[in-house]
Amino acid sequence: MECASCAIKQLIYQYAHYLDGGDLAAVAGLFSRGKIIAAGGDGDTTTEGAEAVAALYASFTRLYPDDGTPHTLHLTGNIVVTVEDDGAAAGAQSSAVVFQAVDGFPLQPIIGVRYEDRFRKAPQGWYFTERRIDTRLVGDLSKHLLRSV
C-alpha cells in the first residue's frame, strides 16, 4: 500500500532540490497540471502550467555560471499533510528558509516562506495542482533574484 503522505512530502522536497540544483525545467515539470500562486500585498499572481512556470522562474532566478545553480539551500520543514477521505486529493502546509552564499556574500538566510499546497492522485501517482507561496520573512535577495518581486 502506498503512503500518500510520503509521496506528497517527496514532491515538496523535490521542488527544493530541483530549485537548488538550478533545474528550472524540473521545477516547472512539477506543475505541468498545476499552478503557482504568489501571495502579494498588491494581490495574488497566478502562473499555470509547466511552460509558464518555467518562464516565471527563468525571469526571476539568478543562476551562476560556475555550476548553473542559484547557490541556495532550501530547508523545508514543518510539513503537515492532510489526505481527503476519498484518497484522491490532499493538501499540505510547510515552511522553508532559503540560505545563500556567493563570492562577497557570506552565508545567510535570504527569505522565509510558507507553502500551502494542493495535490491530486492519478494512476501514475500524486501531483501538484496548486502551490500558494506566502513570503513571510525577507532578507537580502540581491544575489538571488534577477528582478524584484
Where are these regions (language model features)?
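Charge-dense, low-complexity intrinsically disordered segments
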Residues: 2, 44-47, 106
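Short, low-complexity N-terminal intrinsically disordered segments enriched in polar/charged residues
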Residues: 1-21, 25-30
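Binding-site signature for planar aromatic cofactors or substrates
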Residues: 3-12, 40, 51, 58, ...
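A solvent-exposed, acidic/Ser-Thr-rich amphipathic alpha-helical stretch
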Residues: 24-96
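A beta-strand edge to alpha-helix "cap/lid" segment located at domain peripheries
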Residues: 66-149
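Short glycine/serine/threonine-biased micro-segments
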Residues: 20, 47, 110
